[in-house]
From Swiss-Prot:
The protein's name in its UniProt record: Iron-responsive element-binding protein 2
Homology family: Belongs to the aconitase/IPM isomerase family.
Subcellular localization, as worded in the UniProt entry: Cytoplasm
One GO location term (cellular component): cytosol
This protein's record includes keyword Transcription: no
Record lineage: Eukaryota, Metazoa, Chordata, Craniata, Vertebrata
Keyword Mitochondrion: no
Native organism: Sus scrofa (Pig)
Changes after translation: Ubiquitinated and degraded by the proteasome in presence of high level of iron and oxygen. Ubiquitinated by a SCF complex containing FBXL5. Upon iron and oxygen depletion FBXL5 is degraded, preventing ubiquitination and allowing its RNA-binding activity.
Cofactor(s) listed: [4Fe-4S] cluster
Co-factor binding details: Binds 1 [4Fe-4S] cluster per subunit. [4Fe-4S]-binding affects RNA-binding activity, thereby inhibiting activity of the protein.
Gene Ontology MF term list: 4 iron, 4 sulfur cluster binding; aconitate hydratase activity; iron-responsive element binding; metal ion binding
Keyword vocabulary terms for this entry: 4Fe-4S, Cytoplasm, Iron, Iron-sulfur, Metal-binding, RNA-binding, Ubl conjugation
Chief site of localization: cytoplasm
One of the GO biological process terms: intracellular iron ion homeostasis
Amino acid sequence: MDAPSAGYAFEYLIETLNDSSHKKFFNVPRLGGTKYDVLPYSIRVLLEAAVRNCDGFLMKKEDVMNILDWKTKQSNVEVPFFPGRVLLQDFTGIPAMVDFAAMREAVKTLGGDPKKVHPACPTDLTVDHSLQIDFNKCAIQNAPNPGGGDLQKAGKLSPLRVQPKKLPCRGQTACRGSCDSGDLGRNSGKFSSQIENTPILCPFHLQPVPEPETVLKNQEVEFGRNRERLQFFKWSSRVFKNVAVIPPGTGMAHQVNLEYLSRVVFEEKDLLFPDSVVGTDSHITMVNGLGILGWGVGGIETEAVMLGLPVSLTLPEVVGCELTGSSNPFVTSIDVVLGITKHLRQIGVAGKFVEFFGSGVSQLSIVDRTTIANMCPEYGAILSFFPVDNVTLKHLEYTGFNKAKLKSMETYLKAVKLFRNDQDNSGEPEYSQVIQINLNSIVPSVSGPKRPQDRVAVTDMKSDFQACLNEKVGFKGFQIAAEKQNDTVSIHYEGSEYKLSHGSVVIAAVISCTNNCNPSVMLAAGLLAKKAVEAGLRVKPYIRTSLSPGSGMVTHYLSSSGVLPYLSKLGFEIVGYGCSTCVGNTAPLSEAVLNAVKQGDLVTCGVLSGNKNFEGRLCDCVRANYLASPPLVVAYAIAGTVNIDFRTEPLGTDPTGKNIYLHDIWPSREEVHQIEEEHVVLSMFKALKEKIEMGNKRWNSLEAPDSVLFPWDLKSTYIRCPSFFDKLTKEPVALQPIENAHVLLYLGDSVTTDHISPAGSIARSSAAAKYLTNRGLTPREFNSYGARRGNDAVMTRGTFANIKLFNKFIGKPAPKTIHFPSGQTLDVFEAAELYQKEGIPLIILAGKKYGSGNSRDWAAKGPYLLGVKAVLAESYEKIHKDHLIGIGIAPLQFLPGENADSLGLSGRETFSLTFPEELSPGVTLNIKTSTGKIFSVIASFENDVEIILYKHGGLLNFVARKFS
């Protein structure tokens, strides 16, 4: 399906830019005059996209005028939005690209040309969610293979170059090489040599490997275990136009998006328009710090955009956040983020845009802004937007942006009034609500111990943690008896004795794009590590430390500035690029620590410079998890506890016994900025771009087919041609009635997408496990549903397989239901399979907020493949309802005030309904049951586009027919 041509209804607004480039653009301010001038900048971007894509069908003139009239229409109307591009990461990219591959098969079957099937929208796919930390300075457990590849092909492991001073722990124990206090403070040459040759152990052969090869070894294993998926991605990049794959080892999706993929202003056939992006990762919002409108959406919406269709959103309220003042020298971007997070959560910004303005905005660098924008999902906003200003232009110039294009960009943005002049506040937009935050009021802080919004000033950390021990179990409390709060447990580790207590730090990770995009906080961590090592401080060896950058850029400036060896000396060595500890892929703790935690029922702590700290996320046995800036992560690792007052208690002592306090080693802002200016330079950004464009040796040498149709491997348990198109006809058939449908499940309120399609591990007793076992896999090789999204057989069997699913037919939480013709209680999949063999259609009964939670495409695809024709609920989460329509399931809604109970429905009846020939949005339908009861429901379609998609049997069928 072709993308809409530019501005059918508004071609009269096309003008030529008044500069040497002579590019074309839509002069949208002409449309609205003073009404345009008071629109928030983010709404102006929505309006430009609407004007440019107005075709009278997918984007109507009424939609354009609704956006222009934002002040009165906000929160009341749905509007379509055509983003400029799409960003996928590998977990969600697999099902999207598998669907495209299957669509080629379907188009060929219908007699069309499969070579015509391409994404209409530029699509970038980054492979960043497959990294696991198999190698660091410790011996860890042999890891299962989550990607379908052969680990034996991951590359021969390097031999030991330097023997360890002490024997490592054996078996399942995880440990790190000793940090001899006598080594601290040595001359730089000897110091660097010692770090370079620190041995680690191969987790598969218990063979030591030299530390500098840590990253390479993790990447080797990553390519080995994910070979099957990577070959499919490479095929996709070869045969599909508009698809670019960023190979493993390059960086996280949103990090690469910021550093490499962002345009700020798009240029397409000499037409200029604002860059915008949607993607399948909630933290894609980072780019809003660069003045690029972007947010996360679900898999089906992403596929729709790739096929030239818009995403739909409620015209949002826009909260104006005025920043005033300047921050304290000891306050990092993370402190600013956590301060803003708490403030915005308190006032409530869920489902809203946040837009920053005020004198304080110019005090923030681009990396500060992107850090704040990246955290917006944690405080509930759709996005947090920083309009382009002089700071943005200076950043782009600094990073090597073409000067001629930069000048053209500035001219264009000023012409359409998308450039914010920080010297002139006379034309500030009007907002739904304005809040003020004085940057001077923000103090250094951390966030935790269980939620990112629970901010704690560092000065209050000790008293707050002690209060958490006292409080009842809840959002903050652990309810530890007073007489047990001072308990300690001794452990023997690497020949030394240590004591663990409540508050002991056992995981410390400098990780996540939240900080890796910000050189100042990363360099501050490195400088603090340098001063700590020079002062003779160390990190206790049982603490699991790691440094996982968002991209190679971070490695470059940490290395070139000379601070990387000091981080490594404290245990913070680079373990690889991608999501690791942040998403729970941390190496296991040692048995000594685990036993001590269990013995003393200790509340031990993880300290992470990421953006999520929900309980148990890092490790089940680590109950308290705190988000902190990178230098504070290093500081707490050195202290070994969060139960410390940095103002009055020392981190440790130097070799002479002198107390060393945090203020003794904390780098000044001037020091950090000096290092940043000297080492975060243009060459670094050029090197990153070259790395992406050239790929890497393993990716370049990876064999992949280049056939028009993908050669499906029938033995594969990861990638399979889905059955969505099995019954596809050249033309859509008339809407068929649903006759004598049985209820597959009778559910209550707040059924989440995780209840419907779990993403976690595959239970050994599940239908998916039986399928995998029959194909020769062991339970260790099952992996998770999330990793097998490219196999419809696994995902269909995993639908409604959540052990916490409460089906009223069963009366207790279990992934079971009743097959009424036989009376058997079966797994949901087994019952659905029987119904399909008997030719019986299915529906689902539900209460309020059906499909709430994270957007998940398989929460709609799975029920469809089970044979579900309709869902009848009291209310829906809108995104999930859109997904149901997009896959061909009718979303039916009880009349206001009615539900299954009030209508006397047991769910054991059969249900029949007929659709009118002219189905219209919100039409009332009559359902008749086998008991003779007749009641009315609402067909919950909101517009003509949704009805057209439903009549075609869903989005995929609609587009396949277009290509045919």
